[in-house]
Design a protein with these regions (language model features):
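Compositionally biased, intrinsically disordered linkers/stalks adjacent to structured regions
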Residues: 112-135
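A structural "domain/chain start" motif
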Residues: 1-26, 30, 35-37, 42, ...
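Surface-exposed short loop/turn segments
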Residues: 34-38, 45-91, 99-110, 114, ...
Length: 135
């Protein structure tokens, strides 16, 4: 294995975060650049990692006695298709999700960037471990 293709992450979630796909793409490319000797190519790599964001949701997770949300949770879900052109038995098709909780009295806008950064870190680690960490 000498090359990997990591195309731009597709965003298919209903709720929109305009920077998430780009940030996740950059983080994945950086992780593979730092921790592997694989050369990143635009197409036809020995390995290919296709990622799509399938969910971006905020839900209340803790309710107070007066039925107000005390904590909210931002969850990001992704689906990956990892193709190993030399060893197809190592192909991976899997879904991952990661979340972060935040104080429900805060607006999502005020905490979203920091939450997404942490969530992206978790997702990238999970994806890396599921695809090439066993080498």
């Amino acid at each position: 294995m000498k090359t990997i293709t990591i195309p731009y992450v597709e965003y298919k979630a209903l709720r929109v975060n305009p920077s998430l796909a780009g940030d996740l793409t950059d983080a994945l490319q950086e992780k593979f650049r730092k921790l592997t000797r694989l050369e990143q190519v635009d197409e036809e790599g020995d390995l290919e990692l296709v990622v799509e964001v399938t969910g971006y949701d905020v839900k209340a997770t803790a309710i107070t006695a007066d039925e107000q949300a005390a904590q909210s949770r931002l969850t990001v879900s992704v689906k990956i298709e990892f193709t190993n052109r030399k060893y197809p038995e190592d192909d991976v098709s899997q879904s991952f999700s990661a979340y972060e909780d935040f104080d429900a009295t805060l607006s999502l806008d005020s905490v979203e960037a920091g939450l997404c950064e942490t969530i992206i870190d978790k997702l990238v680690e999970d994806i890396f471990n599921a695809t090439v960490a066993q080498w």
